[in-house]
Curated annotation (Swiss-Prot):
Family: Belongs to the PsbT family.
Domain of life where this protein originates: Bacteria
Species in which this protein is naturally found: Synechococcus sp. (strain CC9311)
Protein name, entry field: Photosystem II reaction center protein T
HAMAP family: PSII_PsbT
Bilayer-spanning residue ranges: 3-23
Subcellular location: Cellular thylakoid membrane
Gene behind this protein: psbT
């Protein structure tokens, strides 16, 4: 259960960071 919560928080942090960068600048990576 502890690892699940850790992964959930980590994923949420990464998603927030990704969306912040994505909305700040036009996507330049990949596609």
């Amino acid at each position: 259960m502890e690892s699940f919560a850790y992964i959930l928080i980590l994923g949420l942090a990464i998603a927030t960071l990704f969306f912040a960068i994505a909305f700040r600048d036009p996507p330049k990576i990949g596609k």
